[in-house]
């Protein structure tokens, strides 16, 4: 079975990139994935570039793309199709400030199994606390939570429904949360969260994990205020304590 490509987009916070790569390896079944790192012009200094190159040299990632631009959350990741070495039914997109849970079976095999069972799902991501477009729809008893849009929280994409090669310039100037999800919906596919696969996100950290001198580099984070929080049943697994996403009145 070909390895599923996991595309990690990084922007500063090297400690998060280190943790993200490490925990993917620690929490994903060996031989089932390959990691591709795409950096948004945040590794200009020699130490950071050497760190990124060492990940490649040590075999921790399959490919490395150091972009000379900061594309932010704009979805111009058409470069991904140049990075992958396999052709699989699904691929995964995430950011360096999102960390996977430790589950049995592992998170990747669970998400693939969900996609295999639900041929109508085009985008499937790990759960986060409710946020804007990611607010779920209620009333469905299923292993997924249907919603308006999902972000890059280990977002699994059905390649046949939205192949990487189909990214057009008009799609590359918009945030991925809304536009890619809407485009997938227009193609008749569902957009969902996993019901029982949650992740840890830097939004749960003060200033999203940025050092004081880095906050101003990402204007989206300057006015975010206090980090969002939710309770964990088991911090190692990042599972919810209750089904409030579906049962909230």
Feature map (PLM): residue ranges:
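C-terminal catalytic/acceptor-binding lobe
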Residues: 143-144, 149-151, 165-249
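Acidic donor-binding segment of Leloir-type glycosyltransferases
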Residues: 25-68
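Active-site nucleotide-sugar/metal-binding loop of Leloir-type enzymes
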Residues: 77-90
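Cell-envelope/extracellular polymer assembly enzymes that use nucleotide-activated donors
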Residues: 3-5, 179
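Conserved catalytic core of nucleotide-sugar-dependent glycosyltransferases
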Residues: 72-74, 99-169
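Short, well-formed alpha-helical segments that are part of the catalytic scaffolds
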Residues: 13-26
């Amino acid at each position: 079975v070909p390895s599923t490509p996991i595309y990690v987009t990084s922007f500063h916070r090297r400690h998060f990139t280190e943790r993200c790569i490490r925990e993917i390896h620690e929490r994903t079944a060996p031989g089932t994935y390959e990691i591709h790192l795409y950096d948004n012009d945040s590794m200009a200094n020699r130490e950071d570039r050497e760190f990124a190159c060492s990940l490649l040299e040590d075999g921790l990632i399959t490919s490395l793309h150091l972009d000379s631009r900061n594309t932010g959350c704009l979805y111009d990741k058409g470069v991904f199709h140049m990075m992958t070495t396999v052709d699989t039914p699904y691929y995964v997109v995430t950011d360096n400030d999102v960390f996977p849970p430790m589950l049995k079976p592992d998170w990747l095999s669970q998400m693939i199994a969900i996609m295999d069972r639900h041929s109508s799902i085009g985008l499937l991501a790990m759960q986060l606390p409710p946020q804007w477009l990611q607010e779920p729809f209620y009333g469905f008893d299923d292993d997924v939570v249907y919603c308006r849009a999902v972000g890059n929280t280990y977002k699994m994409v059905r390649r046949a429904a939205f192949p990487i090669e189909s990214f057009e310039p008009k799609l590359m100037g918009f945030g991925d949360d809304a536009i890619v999800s809407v485009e997938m919906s227009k193609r008749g596919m569902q957009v969902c969260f996993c019901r029982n696969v949650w992740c840890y996100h830097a939004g749960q950290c003060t200033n999203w994990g940025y050092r004081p001198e880095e906050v101003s580099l990402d204007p989206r984070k300057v006015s975010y205020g206090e980090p969002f929080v939710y309770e964990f049943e088991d911090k190692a697994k990042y599972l919810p304590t209750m089904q409030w996403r579906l049962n909230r009145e």
